A protein has these predicted regions:
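A short, structured beta-strand-centered segment in the mid-to-C-terminal lobe
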Residues: 87-94
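Catalytic and binding regions of secreted/periplasmic enzymes and modules that target cell-wall glycans
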Residues: 100-139
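Proline-rich, low-complexity linker regions of envelope-associated factors in Gram-negative bacteria
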Residues: 20-29, 141-153
Length: 153
């Protein structure tokens, strides 16, 4: 029993710096996440969950062709209208702009279910959206055009 308590104490001491570090990174991106979540009608908690799962708040992470905070693929971002370089997706603002837009499509295809939305984000939601006849997320040009029309009114 004494060794079990000692082991638990050791695990707590070792894990504490990592959890505090993760919380510090979380706070660093709170405003950015809130802005993009609101713009795409998503719960902030869902965006944070994806970031934690995909990169642990490491914006420079590249793994198997997935890039940045939300580990979006360059081809996926290009399909949504991104015209920059793959390297540009390491920028947190750029990464969230395109990855949260993609997550919004997964969220709609999942009918608002967090767990399913995360699954669709990681594995693709094309077929689920097609079955449900959800429209594709708007491209940047469409968003810019719609905003310009609202401003003109």
């Amino acid at each position: 029993m004494k060794s079990l308590v000692s082991c638990a104490w050791l695990v707590t001491i070792v894990a504490l710096p990592f959890s505090q570090s993760a919380l510090a990174r979380d706070a660093q991106y709170d405003v950015l996440v809130a802005t993009h979540a609101k713009a795409n009608n998503l719960p902030e908690a869902l965006v944070h969950r994806v970031i934690v799962r995909e990169s642990g708040y490491r914006p420079s992470l590249v793994s198997h062709g997935n890039i940045g905070l939300m580990q979006i693929k360059f081809g996926t971002a290009r399909g949504l209208g991104y015209t920059g370089t793959a390297e540009g997706l390491r920028d947190p603002e750029t990464n969230l702009t395109w990855a949260v837009k993609y997550l919004a499509g997964a969220w709609r295809a999942a009918s608002g279910d967090h767990k399913r939305a995360m699954h669709y984000y990681a594995s693709g939601y094309y077929h689920a959206a097609k079955r449900q006849r959800h429209p594709a997320p708007p491209r940047l040009e469409e968003l810019t055009s719609a905003n310009a029309q609202q401003v003109a009114k």
